[in-house]
Amino acid sequence: MNEERIITVFGSSRPAETDADYKEAKELGRRLAEQGFAVCSGGYGGVMEAVSRGAKEAKGKTYGVTAEFFARQANPFIDVEVRMKTWEERLFELIRLADGFVACKGGTGTLVELAVAWEMLNKSVIAGKPMAVVGDFWQPILDRVREVECGARPSSESRVWKEARASLVHSAKTPEEAAKYLALQLEKN
């Protein structure tokens, strides 16, 4: 059985081809494709273009989930464009299609994507979909959430359960580490 596994990558639309964030996302796309994953993104520029480009250069398949809301075309490295009507539909389709997630550096849009996917995992709306962040950009947020979830406040929940919830997002130092982590987690599922 050759079941396609898709990793959705969240990230900023801002990085240009010469930026370090673009290069990191391109490497991530390549590493994911080398692990046998198809790569899904928001389909536009910046990190979305870079991760798709890296995957295509490694002979991987790419998906771009775009929205009529944005007056832009999908980037040229997208094999399959999934066109949604609204921004919200786009967000939930990015999550629905995924077998796992990676968040790269980004702004408020990326923060929302990361937070919604994370909360859906936390509340078991979706299950068995590993999530990673690349680099140290998101680390302060991960640390703060872990502090809130695992703090010393009284709770009927066991500390082990709280720590498991707080650890739903793996912090990967490199694109290679993120791709390997997702492959390992999906092998277990």
Q: Over which residues does each language-model region extend?
A:
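Short, acidic/small-residue loops that bind anionic groups at enzyme active sites
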Residues: 64-68, 104, 120-145, 163-164
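Acidic/glycine-enriched connector segments
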Residues: 23, 46-105, 109
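Glycine/threonine-rich flexible loop motifs
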Residues: 18-20, 111-115
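Glycine-rich, charge-decorated loop segments at or immediately adjacent to ligand/cofactor-binding or catalytic sites
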Residues: 45-50, 138-152
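Short Gly/Thr/Asp-enriched flexible loops that form oxyanion-binding sites at enzyme active sites
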Residues: 50-55, 113-124
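Glycine-rich beta-alpha loop segments
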Residues: 1-63
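Short, conserved catalytic or adaptor-binding loops enriched in Gly and charged residues
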Residues: 73-76, 148-164
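A charged, well-structured terminal subsegment
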Residues: 100, 156-189
